[in-house]
Structure formats: structure tokens, C-alpha cells
Curated annotation (Swiss-Prot):
Belongs to the ZP domain family. ZPC subfamily. The ZP domain is involved in the polymerization of the ZP proteins to form the zona pellucida. GO terms for molecular function: acrosin binding; carbohydrate binding; receptor ligand activity; structural constituent of egg coat. Glycans are attached at residues 124, 146, 155, 161-162, 179, 271. It comes from Bos taurus (Bovine). The modification Pyrrolidone carboxylic acid is found at residue 23. Proteolytically cleaved before the transmembrane segment to yield the secreted ectodomain incorporated in the zona pellucida. N-glycosylated. It is found in: Cell membrane. This is Zona pellucida sperm-binding protein 3. One of its GO terms (biological process) is positive regulation of antral ovarian follicle growth. Coiled coil: none annotated. The lineage of its organism: Eukaryota, Metazoa, Chordata, Craniata, Vertebrata. The chain crosses the membrane at residues 382-402.
């Protein structure tokens, strides 16, 4: 571009000094390494608050804004008091103050707000020299981890896992098919069948845990403190239902530490016509590297060997099942049927144990069991039987009369009349 052309462009772009000023042929090293100017708005996301620092030269034009024209968030929080000589304006607010919005994502907690510059006329003037501006602000905090800058003392598991242990443990008790491959779709049984139960805890990101069935009770309603009731598991994991004529037992080995499977021979309560039961179990967990003991065990009774045996752990932890005293009395969640309410247990985390219920289990009577119930046939069945017998009698009578008429007709034949011989 020649001098004339350059001068012509300068007139068109009057005030564009960058284009019209002469450019040196050398490279100024001091300009290259000069530190860049800090941003006009800086945000510091602290543990419990956010600190916003605003340069009074917000627009970079050299014209300073007034602190009174700045607010933070939907609640229009005002800045901290500062001297007129300060070159910055500061805000310091809590994460849940000033109308800050919290959003929860898969990996982070996001607190969002905005810085508002809303200029107002100064004095009696009705003019503005700066524009209205809104600057969005966000603070991201990871959901997994410690946001404090102070060192933490480790608990029995890492800090991150302790939080999960209080939020992510989900206990369940389900009816399973005989081969344990899937959940049983229909809760119907016949007396003499065997119910396959699977207790499980979903640990999420927790450290590995081992699940135990501490206590189980069968009742006619989901309220396991009502009568009648039948104890299936007692004494911190002793499957006492196997002591009777039943073959109830825990399945060994486990498929996984967080799963415990066991079978119960189905039954119904005598002198009750509902033919259904609910099973409520108290489940709890321990770290998987903890050796089972008398308070945390799964023991079954073998009639062939006449002794108790654990699913895992030392054999002697099941000896207390025969005595009915395992560990310190009152430590387990046991039902006080006299008082009709559960006895509370002292525990460190509420979510390390839970009460879960499955049911109703519905029992269908077998066809050959009707005669065993005694002479209690219902009147509709009697009337139906009499009606069928009457119909069959009338049908046989009609058949006999029809055959008799045909035999008489055959003994006296009628000859057809011929037109001519």
C-alpha cells in the first residue's frame, strides 16, 4: 500500500491510530515479555464461599465504575466496603447466599450466579457514560473428594467412601427361582415347597462389604411385631428354622460377599385361613476383610452331622447357636413381642443395617389335601356335584329309552307298497 492509499484509509478510519501510526521495523523484546493485564473479574471458589474481585476499570477504557453500580446475584448483594482509592471492588458471599443456584451433575456440584453492572445517573444528571453488563459466574466442586484445604484424619475407610457409605447402600430381599438364576415372578407356593430367598446390598462405590442376615421373622402382616409370628433366623445369624422338621439352610459358598442366599421350607400358621406370610429380615454389613465372629455370621444346622456350620469363618462361631446366647445381649436388632415394638440398636451408621420385607408368600393347597381338612366341604361344591349326577342319570335314561324303541321297531318291519305285481 502506497503513501496516498495509506493516507486515504486513515481519513476513513479516523481515530484508528493503530493503522495510521508508523510501525517500527524492529521487535521490542520488552513488549513481548511484559506481563499481561489480569482479568477484569476474578472469582475464587473457596470451601464455603465465593470471593469476586472486580477491577474498577471494568471495560478497559480508563473510565472507572462506581461500586454502588455493582451487585451480585438475583438478591442484589452489595460489595464489601472499600476506600475510594482502591482499584478493585470485592464481594464475599456464602455458596447458598444471594440467590445462588445449585446444580448437581454426575461429577460436580455447580453453584452459579452473576455479577451485574447497572449504571445509574450521577447526581442530577440524566446521562450514562457506561453500559449495563452482566457477567455469569460459576463455581464447580467435585462430588467425590474433600474440598477443604486442611488435612483430614482417615476413618476406617477413605473419606470419599465414608460419604458413599451413608448415601449409597441399598438393601434388598427377593424371592428367587430354584436355580437362583432370576427373581421369582409369582409368589405362590404349595405346602412342602421350598422358598429361595436372596439378601443383597448394592454398595455403589463403597469399599467391598460382606452382608449378613442378623434376624428374620415370619408374620401374617408386614408389621413383624404382630402375633402370631415364627422366627426363622435368630442370635445374630443362626438359621434356627432348620432345627425343626424343616431343611432350611444358608447356601454355601456365597456367589459374592454382598449376597447371601438361603432356603426356607414354606409353612402357614395353624388356625388361620389367610394362607399367606410375610418375611422380614434385619440385614447388616461389615468390611469384607473382617473375619466373621459371633455377632456377624451365617450358620446352618445339619441334621446328618447334628452340628452347626458357618458359611465362612471359624467353625466355633456357631457354637453359641445351640446355647441361644451369641455375643453381648441386646446388641442385635431383636423384636420384643411382649412390648410389640423393635428394640433399638446402637450403631455407628444407620445405613450399615436395615429391615427389609418380602411378601406376601401365598400358599396353594394341593388337590390330595382336601380330604385331610375334614368334612368342611362348601355348599356350592355339594350342589354342583348333585347337579352333575342328575344330568348324567337323565342322559343314561334317554339312551336306554332310545335303544328300546329301536328294538321294537326292528321286530315288526313295515313292507313298502308296490305299484303293480
Amino acid at each position: 500500500m502506497g503513501p496516498c492509499s495509506r493516507l486515504f484509509v486513515c481519513f476513513l478510519l479516523w481515530g484508528s491510530t493503530e493503522l495510521c501510526s508508523p510501525q517500527p521495523f524492529w521487535d521490542d523484546e520488552t513488549e513481548r515479555f511484559r506481563p499481561s493485564k489480569p482479568p477484569a473479574v476474578m472469582v475464587e471458589c473457596q470451601e464455603a464461599q465465593l470471593v469476586v474481585t472486580v477491577d474498577k476499570d471494568l471495560f478497559g477504557t480508563g473510565k472507572l465504575i462506581r461500586p454502588a453500580d455493582l451487585t451480585l446475584g438475583p438478591d442484589n448483594c452489595e460489595p464489601l466496603a472499600s476506600a475510594d482509592t482502591d482499584g478493585v471492588v470485592r464481594f464475599a458471599v456464602g455458596l447458598h447466599e444471594c440467590g445462588n443456584i445449585l446444580q448437581v451433575t454426575d461429577n460436580a456440584l455447580v453453584y452459579s450466579t452473576f455479577l451485574l453492572h447497572n449504571p445509574r445517573p450521577a447526581g442530577n444528571l440524566s446521562i450514562l457514560r457506561t453500559n449495563r453488563a452482566e457477567v455469569p459466574i460459576e463455581c464447580h466442586y467435585p462430588r467425590q473428594g474433600n474440598v477443604s484445604s486442611w488435612a483430614i484424619q482417615p476413618t476406617w475407610v477413605p473419606f470419599r467412601t465414608t460419604v458413599f457409605s451413608e448415601e449409597k447402600l441399598v438393601f434388598s430381599l427377593r424371592l428367587m427361582e430354584e436355580n437362583w438364576s432370576a427373581e421369582k415372578m409369582t409368589p405362590t407356593f404349595q405346602l412342602g415347597d421350598r422358598a429361595h430367598l436372596q439378601a443383597q446390598v448394592h454398595t455403589g462405590s463403597h469399599v467391598p462389604l460382606r452382608l449378613f442376615v442378623d434376624h428374620c421373622v415370619a408374620s401374617l402382616t408386614p408389621d413383624w411385631s404382630t402375633s402370631p409370628y415364627h422366627t426363622i433366623v435368630d442370635f445374630h445369624g443362626c438359621l434356627v428354622d432348620g432345627l425343626t422338621d424343616a431343611s432350611s439352610a444358608f447356601k454355601a459358598p456365597r456367589p459374592r460377599p454382598e449376597i447371601l442366599q438361603f432356603t426356607v421350607d414354606v409353612f402357614r400358621f395353624a388356625n388361620d385361613s389367610r394362607n399367606m406370610i410375610y418375611i422380614t429380615c434385619h440385614l447388616k454389613v461389615t468390611p469384607v476383610d473382617r473375619v466373621p465372629d459371633q455377632l456377624n455370621k451365617a450358620c446352618s444346622f445339619s441334621k446328618s452331622s447334628n452340628r452347626w456350620s458357618p458359611v465362612e469363618g471359624p467353625t466355633d462361631i456357631c457354637r453359641c447357636c445351640s446355647k441361644g446366647r451369641c455375643g453381648i445381649s441386646g446388641r442385635s436388632m431383636r423384636l420384643s413381642h411382649r412390648e410389640g415394638r423393635p428394640v433399638p440398636r446402637s450403631r455407628r451408621h444407620v445405613t450399615e443395617e436395615a429391615d427389609v420385607t418380602v411378601g406376601p408368600l401365598i400358599f396353594l393347597r394341593k388337590m390330595n389335601d382336601r380330604g385331610v381338612e375334614g368334612p368342611t366341604s362348601s355348599p356350592p361344591l355339594v350342589m354342583l356335584g348333585l347337579g352333575l349326577a342328575t344330568v348324567m342319570t337323565l342322559t343314561l335314561a334317554a339312551i336306554v329309552l332310545g335303544l328300546t324303541g329301536r328294538l321294537r321297531a326292528a321286530s315288526h318291519p313295515v313292507c313298502p307298497v308296490s305299484a303293480s305285481q
